[in-house]
Amino acid sequence: MDIPNKVIKGKIALGKICFHKIAFLDRDGTINKDKNYIYKIDDFEFLPGVISGLKKLQQNGFLLVIVTNQSGVARGYYKEEDIEVLHKWMFQELEKSGVSIAKVYYCPHLPDATIEKYRKNCNCRKPKTELYYKAISELKRLYDLD
């Protein structure tokens, strides 16, 4: 029996089996210059070659996902809302160059955090893997992947 191949929204579907590639990227030091606890747009600077590299990944069928530790929240240097504003701006800047980030996942926790709400030894802080599994689960639903 032949299983029809078809392309749907950048994924290849073979019957009910779907394949997708995901590139998991860190933010600070990978996407932007790491200047310690960046949360202001004025402090954010894309690294040279990053935009063209992201384009190449995207053109080769990768969903682009950022996974980043943001302990500045736990330290009280900035708030989660500040990160969200920065990420929204970053998405808009990348979109101008034809680059789409599927989603950003971040860990605001730290075992010895200044802000009690964020003081925990969590499983989402890299190099632990909770955020990666969360991303895969959410993206499977979002892109209807099996």
Residue ranges and their predicted role:
Residues V50, L54-M90, S100-A113:
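Substrate-recognition element of Asp-dependent hydrolases with the DxDx(T/V) motif
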Residues I17-D34, T68:
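Asp-based phosphoryl-transfer active-site loop
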Residues K120-D146:
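Conserved Lys-Pro-Asp/Glu-containing loop-to-beta segment of HAD-superfamily phosphomonoesterases
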Residues M90-E95, I136, K140:
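Conserved hydrophobic residues forming the short capping helix/wall of the S-adenosyl-L-methionine
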Residues D42-D43, G76-E81, R119:
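Short, solvent-exposed loop/turn segments at secondary-structure boundaries
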Residues M1-L25:
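Non-catalytic pre-domain segments flanking phosphatase-related domains
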Residues C107-P127:
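Glycine/Thr-rich beta-alpha phosphate-binding loop at enzyme active sites
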Residues K35-L54:
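Basic, amphipathic juxtamembrane/active-site segments
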